[in-house]
Amino acid sequence: MKVKIKQIYQFEGASSLPAYSTNGSAGMDLYAAIASPMIIKPHETALVPAGIAISLPYGYEAQIRSRSGLASKFGVIVLNSPGTIDSDYRGELKIIMINLGQKDFQLTPAMRIAQMVIAKYEVVSWELVDDLDETERGKNGFGSSGLK
């Protein structure tokens, strides 16, 4: 599938376009479109520009997710993961990041900061009913299926 993309920020000597790291990657890396290093202090958030805008076809969304390395090594994650980019949004993608670690985290220009997964979705219509179908699980939730 081809998706239209507008490059808003051009890195010196590097591309800001999302890229798959391996042939089997589901997510494309997104890069920090910043001109100079940026510090995210412990327990603080930052809105980090990705330097691109996209035009997704109707019926698709882009999901913005944390990178496992940043999460496991530094405690830095995408706050509203997965963040949804709707098919009718045309502005620059920006990533809400939070530092859950104990130390300052330094973002550098062109650093890989998040992943973007393109996903198909269905538009639903609601059918109002008095009762729902019975299931074995019923209304049990919040750990009711056990840990093992």
Swiss-Prot record:
Keywords: Hydrolase, Magnesium, Metal-binding, Nucleotide metabolism. GO terms for molecular function: dUTP diphosphatase activity; magnesium ion binding. SUPFAM superfamilies: dUTPase-like. GO terms for biological process: dUMP biosynthetic process; dUTP catabolic process. Pathway: Pyrimidine metabolism; dUMP biosynthesis; dUMP from dCTP (dUTP route): step 2/2. Its EC number is 3.6.1.23. It is an enzyme of class 3 (hydrolase). InterPro entries: dUTPase (IPR008181), dUTPase-like (IPR029054), dUTPase-like_sf (IPR036157), dUTPase_trimeric (IPR033704). Substrate binds at residues 67-69, 80, 84-86, 94. It catalyses: dUTP + H2O = dUMP + diphosphate + H(+). It comes from the Bacteria. This enzyme is involved in nucleotide metabolism: it produces dUMP, the immediate precursor of thymidine nucleotides and it decreases the intracellular concentration of dUTP so that uracil cannot be incorporated into DNA. This is Deoxyuridine 5'-triphosphate nucleotidohydrolase. It comes from Orientia tsutsugamushi (strain Boryong).
